[in-house]
Regions:
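Extracellular/periplasmic carbohydrate-active domains that bind, remodel
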Residues: 1-424
Length: 424
């Protein structure tokens, strides 16, 4: 059954429509589920809580526009229909605590099953770059979609713009499908942490931060996506991960908003030509201590992808940064991929306890003009580097620098002089 928000009092207005939209969701939930329909028009809202068996459906021309006031995203904490236990012990990390201000979102789901957000072409979720001087980095506001401890999540068709923090922040959830979703501007495009069985396909993530991020994820497929960002294309780890048929390119359309001035952030400016528009690694390993990593990160295959203009092919600096200090990558393979415009060596610093197996097969790599003399790799605590049918362009001395011993093998290995790393 459909529940149109206009039947519950929602109108196109500068005034907040949060109460009317939430009433439609609650009525649908109490009736056993159905669709809550957002018709064409711009409806301004604070946080709305999505509940079990409810589909939020945006018709063509529908816009859910966030409030400019970050305090308007806290109302779910006073929910009386499904009260939250705010007195229970809470995790000290703001990003782990689902009730923290950092975890606010325009659309919030907690402990729900069978939820969906579906948008027809031409439907939008607009985060308005909501400015929060008490938020992360003293300017980030709520996420667009914030989901914790949920099962059976279906996302399709809508476009997100100007998300005040991550466009999708999904934690401790299972069975996630995201299809034909577009994200423009804002921060990260899609973040998952401690999630199982995730499919992301046919999406566009053109963001001001990472495209896809997260760790402690099992059984993930990412395919047929168009990727453009001002940070890492993939800042990710997990077990049993397939990334295929994706295209990533740089420079970024939207600069990293952290590089805006304080005045520009407060004015909710999207981007400027002076912002940082470069893209770092195509793939950076991610593994901090906000989650107990359940399985060794590995069995990751990246195949039939093209990366143009990234600074680095791969980066893992295990133990050197707070975001890379929990469990190292143990195995990753790039197959039938092309990298153009690289200007820094792949830094592969693993763990002596769990050394990495890193594989390139049928891979083409070109160095950026002006950086022809860069090393190809900088290695530490590795088990095996396998180089099969690796073709290089514009490298004058594609050496591999080693800090510890390990095996370098494959039919292309002879093309890479191996030298001990020396501090400059």
């Amino acid at each position: 059954m459909d529940y149109r928000i206009t039947d519950f009092g929602a109108v196109v207005s500068d005034a907040l429509q949060t109460e009317a939209i939430q009433k439609a969701i609650d009525t649908c939930f109490l009736a056993g589920g159905g669709r809550v329909v957002i018709p064409a028009g711009a409806f301004r809202t604070g946080c709305i809580r999505l509940r079990s068996n409810v589909t939020l459906y945006l018709e063509s021309g529908a816009i859910l526009e966030g409030s400019w006031d970050p305090d308007d995203y806290c109302s779910y904490l006073q929910d009386t229909l499904e009260p939250l236990d705010l007195d229970a012990p809470r995790h000290p990390s703001r990003s782990v605590d689902p009730f923290s201000r950092w975890n606010n979102g325009l659309i919030k789901a907690i402990n729900a099953k069978n939820i969906a957000i579906i948008g027809e072409p031409g439907s939008y979720l607009d985060g308005v770059n909501c400015y929060d001087p008490t938020g992360e980095e003293k300017y980030r506001g709520p996420h667009m979609i914030n989901i914790h401890n949920c099962e059976n999540i279906y996302l399709e068709g809508y476009t997100i713009r100007r998300s005040a923090n991550w466009a999708h922040n999904i934690c401790r959830s299972q069975n996630i499908t995201c299809r034909k979703v577009a994200v423009y501007g804002g921060h990260d495009g899609f973040d998952i942490r401690t999630c199982d069985h995730t499919l992301i396909e046919d999406c566009i993530f053109h963001t001001g931060d990472d495209c896809v991020a997260g760790f402690d994820n099992h059984d993930v497929v990412i395919r047929n996506c168009d990727l453009n960002c001002a940070c890492n294309v993939f800042r990710f780890s997990g077990a049993d991960v397939l990334i295929e048929n994706c295209n990533a390119f740089s420079p970024a359309r939207f600069g990293h908003r952290w590089t805006l001035s304080d005045q520009e952030k407060a004015a909710r400016i999207e981007t400027t030509s002076e912002s940082r528009h470069t893209t770092g690694p195509a793939f950076a390993h991610y593994c901090d201590f906000r989650a107990e990593i359940r399985r060794a990160p590995g069995n990751i295959l990246v195949r039939n992808c093209e990366f143009s203009g990234m600074d680095i092919l791969y980066q893992m600096t295990f133990g050197d940064h707070v975001w890379c200090c929990n469990r190292p990558m143990t195995q990753i393979k790039f197959q039938d991929c092309k990298f153009t415009g690289i200007w820094q060596p792949s830094t592969i610093h693993g763990s002596a306890e769990e050394p990495i197996v890193f594989e390139l097969e049928n891979v083409e790599v070109s160095a950026r003009e002006g950086y022809e003399d860069i090393a190809f790799m900088d290695l530490r605590d590795f088990k095996t580097i396998s180089l099969e049918n690796v073709t290089l362009h514009n490298f004058t001395n594609p050496r591999i620098l080693t800090r510890t011993e390990g095996e370098i093998t494959g039919n292309s290995a002879a093309n890479f002089p191996v030298e001990p790393y020396q501090e400059s």
